Amino acid sequence: MIEIDKFVSRHIGPRNEDIGEMLKLINCSSLDELIEKTVPNHIIFKDKLKFRPGMSEEFNKINTQLLSLKNNFKKTYIGMGYYNTITPSVILRNILENPGWYTAYTPYQPEVSQGRLEMLMNFQQMIIDLTGMDIANASLLDESTAAAEAMMMAFKIKKSAKFTFCVQNKCHPQTLSVLKTRAKPLGIKIIFDNPDDDTFGCLIQNPDTYGEIANLNDLININKSHDALSIIAADIMSLVVMKSPRDFG
């Protein structure tokens, strides 16, 4: 019997005699026979794989660079919140490539590094500075998920009989899809552009999916007239040069 409570047995694997006992138990004479009985014959690749001769790391690097020259570089016009960005080398070297962010470990929580915690805190502070919010979390999965969570927060904050959520017509389609998925089981109705008295919250995309900048003052005042909370789906980079959502009230 293998002693599974010991490190060696758990992590190094079975010995040859152990393999023999296991094969005997399932009536197989070898591992090859086990594979033949397990994997359907029509998908087993019996020929030898054709590999190129081995090469040194330096030669492989040069060869990869030469292959990359055959790529066709095209401009992307996808939009919809996905924009090319440039990371300055000083940030790349001192932040993304700095091992100090991911090697200093926290004694009380060994699975999370102190550097990562500090980076998340800096991220949250940056979001607070750019948006004008009092607090900020450490990010969600993506913008669509964040919009859905914001809708749910507005729904719970209002604690009323309102079940309508208004979305700006030029919202990113991927965001709208997630909103609809989250709203349906809760009985929340999604409407576009024009909130009514049954609206508890309204999502405004700024800049919108076409890159246009909205007049938030007018939109927020309309929402207030219906006692609806305003949620701004903002491009963080744009807030460097634009008013923060808080400045619009």
Model regions and ranges:
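Short loop-beta-helix segment that forms the pyridoxal 5′-phosphate
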Residues: 108-112, 129-148
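Hydrophobic alpha-helical scaffolding
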Residues: 9-12, 24, 50-54, 110-113, ...
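Charged, compositionally biased N-terminal leader segments and the immediate start
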Residues: 1-14, 18, 22
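Gly-rich Lys/Arg/Thr-decorated short loops/hinges at beta-loop-alpha junctions or inter-strand turns
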Residues: 2, 98-110, 128-133, 159-163, ...
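Conserved PLP-enzyme active-site core in the AAT-like
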Residues: 145-249
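Structural signal for hydrophobic packing residues in well-ordered secondary-structure cores
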Residues: 30, 42, 64-72, 124, ...
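N-terminal entrance/gating region of PLP-dependent enzymes' catalytic architecture
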Residues: 14, 37-122, 128
